[in-house]
């Protein structure tokens, strides 16, 4: 068994660690480029050429399952998460989704989950891949928080704000987009954009959509949030009593020791 594992890992290494698969990311001034080039040439010389005529991207056939798990702990607070995806149902991403995060984080979710519900925190996001989530943490509630999440579309459908308040939401969103970054963070953002094929044009488009967001667009986004919630994906960690009281929400309940 040990010899077989070694053989498999050696074969895998020969496919992965080849010149054709090498990518290098550097965050530096021009003075840092020369040392990299010198060291990189030595590394490239030691890497073998690929034995494959054409490097193929792996095809994944993973089939996700709906877990909907509840985990019991000895603690007295809960962590409740709802997630889903809207792009799989044909809803395109819009920069207004980032404004939604600000609106919900500082208004509806803040008031309902933190102020009224007593949770230590709550957060949400709706990404460019269509993934959306709403999460509470150190929350005295479980089923009640899930009900708050379910009512987000209704809140958005009735959303209204004057020009001053709407501008505050937009400024709050832009402040997150324009957070000062360290050189390391700038480099990481750049490499992530390259790896995921995000262009400057896409970033600018998202920014323009944030700046032009209005109440009507926020109301229209209720459909996107409804689609995310329609997946019905939930996971929660909490006390035995709270998890049992909400057992109809879960496909499986387990105990965390």
Q: What spans do the regions from the language model cover?
A:
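C-terminal structured domain segments
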Residues: 41, 49-53, 203-206, 220, ...
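Aromatic-residue-lined binding/catalytic grooves and analogous aromatic/hydrophobic interfacial grooves
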Residues: 2-6, 12
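A positional "C-terminalness" feature that preferentially activates on distal terminal regions of long
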Residues: 245-246
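M16 family metallopeptidases and their MPP-like homologs
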Residues: 1, 19-28, 79-100, 108-215, ...
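Short amphipathic alpha-helices in soluble, non-transmembrane regions
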Residues: 36-44, 148-152, 249-250
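His/Glu-based metal-binding/catalytic segments typifying zinc-dependent metallopeptidases
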Residues: 14, 21-33, 37-115, 256-257
């Amino acid at each position: 068994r040990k010899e077989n594992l070694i053989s498999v890992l050696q074969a895998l290494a020969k496919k992965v660690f080849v010149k054709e698969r090498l990518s290098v990311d550097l965050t530096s001034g021009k003075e840092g480029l020369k040392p990299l080039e010198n060291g990189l040439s030595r590394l490239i010389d030691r890497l073998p050429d690929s034995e494959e005529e054409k490097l193929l991207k792996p095809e994944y056939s993973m089939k996700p399952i709906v877990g909907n798990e509840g985990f019991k702990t000895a603690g007295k607070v809960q962590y409740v998460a709802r997630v889903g995806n809207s792009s799989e149902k044909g809803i395109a991403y819009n920069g207004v989704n980032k404004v939604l995060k600000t609106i919900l984080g500082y208004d509806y979710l803040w008031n309902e989950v933190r102020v009224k519900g007593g949770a230590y925190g709550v957060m949400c996001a709706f990404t460019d891949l269509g993934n959306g989530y709403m999460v509470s943490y150190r929350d005295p509630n479980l089923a009640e928080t899930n009900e708050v999440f379910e009512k987000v579309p209704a809140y958005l459908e009735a959303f209204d704000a004057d020009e001053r308040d709407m501008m505050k939401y937009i400024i709050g969103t832009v402040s997150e987009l324009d957070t000062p970054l360290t050189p390391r963070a700038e480099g990481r953002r750049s490499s992530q954009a390259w790896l995921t094929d995000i262009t400057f044009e896409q970033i600018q488009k998202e920014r323009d959509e944030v700046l032009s967001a209005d109440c009507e667009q926020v109301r229209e986004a209720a459909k996107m949030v409804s689609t995310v919630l329609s997946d019905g994906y939930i996971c929660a960690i909490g006390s035995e009593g709270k998890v049992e009281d909400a057992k109809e929400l879960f496909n499986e309940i387990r105990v965390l020791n």
